[in-house]
């Protein structure tokens, strides 16, 4: 199943959700994340937290949800306030 996590800036929550899902979802789940107004950078504390948890941060980037339109996720989850 393909999951797309969305938040405004794709800098913290959606990035963490993507990384954790991909780390623990096995072959059943594929996750990506995006933002409606991406900041262009992942928050350094998000990277630090994930690395401390032993979760791979390679390839994580802040990007627009437009970048995932062709990917066609099965579920879109918003993680905004």
Whereabouts are the PLM-identified features?
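Glycine/proline-rich loop-helix segments at beta-alpha junctions forming the active-site rim
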Residues: 63-81
